[in-house]
């Protein structure tokens, strides 16, 4: 029986069996002052547990409905225990003065960054679920990162109240909608990465921006043919994320096996780390800033906030691109073909900083490609979304969905777009639910269509030295529609998909964009 879940955002609800810990905005743990703790002899009032919102009902609506239903009977909480739903903790008390305002701004910014960092847990849970249920082919690497997952199951909380480790064995089952979306995302990107590595005889290199707990490097190294074609693989992410990833790599024999004997951790040779100790060397933060968490012959793990590469960043926080990606931190070669991966990254970055990053990464390498997976708030039903498949140019592909043109033609087509399209109804629901998790989408708002996201690469990479720029973009719905009947049937039967209309709407709001640039 089909559920009435129209306009449901995948982040809003989950399966009943895992709704308490997966896909929900991380709950903040209340810290009670020591003088307010109860004495062991005092009577303690026990309140009934809060009901779990039912599937298909946005959490904000579920919470408001439940609160209205119980407010008449339940006693009002003590003033010191009040929290404002959906607002940072700093807004629940009145503050005054410049110092308090500055503190509030800093706290809010930190909460927003923590929320973005925490999205890696969603992606990892989704891949684990798709692997467990047979959507994706089995591989042993992804599960090695699972113990770094946050959980809402009562585990200790870390900075800003976000739960810390999720232990193997916890429920990781996602809804069929999410599992199919994860399959389409992972299988499409995996196929494009493999195609890139197999092109020609040259070795290739890959830069994954916002890599999180991704296991792609290890999957490449497990393939004899692909591993010999890979020159170097670089992963960049927040320091908190790379620290967690380092811990898992050092504790996992399977993951450590792909690091050669000359590898180093924060500059310390891997061979110097005791095989009987799982301790991670401390990064002392010397005067010369060091970004390489792990440095191996074919792999570099870098701890950096890519937003700080922008020249408008305060000098104390600014990161030099040459210092980050130069020979001191990585084994990248600017003359080799390079693929840059942005998996659900650009949506969270202010458009001016993201465009600067795209442009300067493109200028750094002679032959560069980009593969971006992101949110399309306007969906693929908007007229400009279709234009990406049929933009006219001198060398337009005959197949709708692949636009190939020179730099000049790419720029001329981009000027025909009058203004950003507004989010669809479903896109607005997505924004509301993500904002409840302290997630802002400045990049997705600035580029709401697939066409706009495709053209941002053409604009960023167009200069007098460019020989050719090719761009294309497709929604996950388009990829789903083009699957063979046998494969779609297999995926639908795995869990008995009965939410046809909902999955179509969901897949229309996620896209994969490709761009390629070569110099003469």
Curated annotation (Swiss-Prot):
InterPro entries: LCMT1, Ppm1/Ppm2/Tcmp, SAM-dependent_MTases_sf. Residues 1-116, 142-174 are annotated as: Disordered. Its EC number is 2.1.1.233. GO terms for molecular function: protein C-terminal leucine carboxyl O-methyltransferase activity. It holds the Pfam family LCM. S-adenosyl-L-methionine binds at residues 185, 210, 237, 305-306, 343. SUPFAM superfamilies: S-adenosyl-L-methionine-dependent methyltransferases. Residues 79-89 have a biased composition (Low complexity). It catalyses: [phosphatase 2A protein]-C-terminal L-leucine + S-adenosyl-L-methionine = [phosphatase 2A protein]-C-terminal L-leucine methyl ester + S-adenosyl-L-homocysteine. It is an enzyme of class 2 (transferase). Keywords: Methyltransferase, S-adenosyl-L-methionine, Transferase. Methylates the carboxyl group of the C-terminal leucine residue of protein phosphatase 2A catalytic subunits to form alpha-leucine ester residues. Belongs to the methyltransferase superfamily. LCMT family. This is Leucine carboxyl methyltransferase 1. It comes from Mycosarcoma maydis. The lineage of its organism: Eukaryota, Fungi, Dikarya, Basidiomycota, Ustilaginomycotina.
């Amino acid at each position: 029986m089909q559920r009435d879940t129209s306009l449901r955002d995948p982040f809003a609800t989950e399966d009943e069996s895992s709704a308490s810990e997966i896909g929900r905005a991380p709950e903040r743990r209340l810290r009670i002052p020591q003088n307010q703790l109860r004495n062991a002899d005092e009577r303690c009032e026990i309140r009934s547990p809060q009901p779990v919102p039912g599937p298909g009902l946005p959490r904000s609506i579920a919470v408001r409905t439940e609160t209205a239903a119980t407010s008449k009977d339940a006693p009002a909480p003590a003033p010191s225990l009040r929290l404002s739903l959906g607002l940072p903790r700093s807004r629940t008390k009145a503050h005054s003065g410049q110092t308090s305002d500055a503190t509030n701004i800093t706290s809010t910014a930190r909460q927003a960054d923590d929320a973005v960092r925490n999205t890696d847990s969603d992606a990892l849970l989704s891949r684990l679920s798709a692997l467990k249920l047979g959507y994706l082919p089995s591989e042993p690497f992804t599960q090695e990162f699972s113990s770094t997952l946050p959980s809402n199951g009562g585990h200790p909380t870390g900075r800003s109240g976000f739960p810390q480790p999720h232990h193997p064995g916890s429920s990781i089952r996602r809804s069929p909608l999410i599992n199919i979306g994860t399959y389409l995302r992972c299988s499409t990107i995996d196929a494009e990465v493999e195609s890139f590595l197999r092109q020609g005889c040259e070795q290739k290199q890959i830069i994954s921006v916002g890599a999180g707990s991704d296991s792609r490097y290890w999957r490449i190294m497990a393939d004899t043919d692909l591993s010999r074609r890979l020159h170097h693989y670089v992963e960049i992410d927040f320091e908190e994320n790379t620290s967690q990833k380092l811990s898992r790599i050092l504790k996992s024999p399977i993951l450590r096996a792909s690091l050669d004997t000359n590898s180093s951790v924060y500059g310390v040779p891997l061979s110097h780390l005791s095989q009987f100790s799982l301790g991670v060397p401390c990064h002392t933060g010397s005067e010369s800033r060091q970004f390489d968490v792990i440095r191996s012959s074919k792999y570099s793990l870098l701890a950096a906030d890519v937003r700080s590469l922008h020249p408008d960043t305060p000098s104390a926080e600014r990161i030099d691109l040459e210092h980050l990606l130069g020979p001191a931190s990585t084994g990248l070669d600017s003359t080799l073909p390079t693929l840059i991966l942005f998996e659900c990254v650009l949506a969270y970055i202010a458009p001016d900083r993201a465009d600067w990053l795209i442009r300067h990464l493109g200028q750094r390498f002679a032959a560069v490609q980009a593969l971006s997976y992101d949110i399309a708030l306007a969906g693929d039903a908007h007229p400009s979304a279709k234009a990406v498949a049929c933009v006219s140019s001198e060398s337009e592909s005959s197949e709708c969905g692949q636009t190939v043109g020179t730099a000049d033609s790419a720029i001329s087509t981009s000027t025909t777009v009058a203004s950003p399209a507004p989010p669809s109804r479903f896109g607005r629901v997505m924004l509301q639910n993500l904002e409840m998790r302290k997630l802002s989408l400045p990049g997705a708002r600035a580029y709401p269509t697939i066409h706009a996201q495709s053209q941002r690469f053409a604009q960023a990479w167009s200069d007098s030295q460019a020989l050719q720029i090719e761009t294309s973009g497709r929604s996950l719905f388009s990829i789903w529609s083009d699957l063979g009947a046998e494969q779609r049937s297999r995926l639908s039967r795995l869990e008995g998909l009965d939410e046809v209309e909902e999955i179509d709407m969901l897949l229309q709001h996620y896209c994969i964009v490709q761009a390629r640039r070569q110099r003469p």
